[in-house]
């Protein structure tokens, strides 16, 4: 059995778990090949760390990502974080880490923004009911 690296990525309420093992470059998200994922915007987000890493690194590994929770874009960004962290851990290459950080810091560090809780007296976190009209 070869080497296996497990990493996680979170975005809003979406959680992704990536398993990276020796292989021939297969990338699957929820058991579906990455090149058939729709919408295209989500597919491009997931492909970003693979493109930056380069074909020579990606062709040596198989990546399986399981994502749950959140919306389709949050799931794509969570998968992207998990893949990027996994490839950095797999290669142990500080240059790859620097390339990810230069492209987008949130690819490795995550994005701390969360939904603000709703308060009483209005429809949302900040919106209030109208006091009077005329």
UniProtKB/Swiss-Prot annotation:
Residues 109-134 are annotated as: Disordered. GO terms for molecular function: RNA binding; structural constituent of ribosome. PROSITE patterns: RIBOSOMAL_S9. The keyword NADP does not apply. One of its GO terms (cellular component) is cytosolic small ribosomal subunit. Belongs to the universal ribosomal protein uS9 family. PANTHER family: RIBOSOMAL PROTEIN S16, RIBOSOMAL PROTEIN S9. This is Small ribosomal subunit protein uS9. It comes from Methanopyrus kandleri (strain AV19 / DSM 6324 / JCM 9639 / NBRC 100938).
């Amino acid at each position: 059995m070869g080497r296996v690296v497990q990493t996680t990525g979170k975005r809003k309420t979406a959680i992704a778990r990536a398993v990276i093992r020796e292989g021939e470059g297969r990338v699957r998200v929820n058991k579906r090949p990455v090149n058939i994922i729709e919408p295209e915007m989500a597919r491009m987000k997931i492909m970003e760390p693979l493109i930056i890493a380069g074909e020579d690194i990606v062709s040596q590994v198989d990546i399986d990502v399981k994502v749950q929770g959140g919306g389709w874009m949050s799931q794509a960004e969570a998968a992207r974080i998990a893949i990027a962290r996994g490839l950095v851990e797999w290669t142990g290459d500080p240059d790859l880490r620097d390339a990810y950080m230069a492209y987008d810091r949130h690819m490795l560090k995550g994005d701390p923004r969360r939904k603000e809780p709703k308060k009483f007296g209005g429809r949302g976190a900040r919106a209030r009911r109208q006091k009077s009209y005329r």
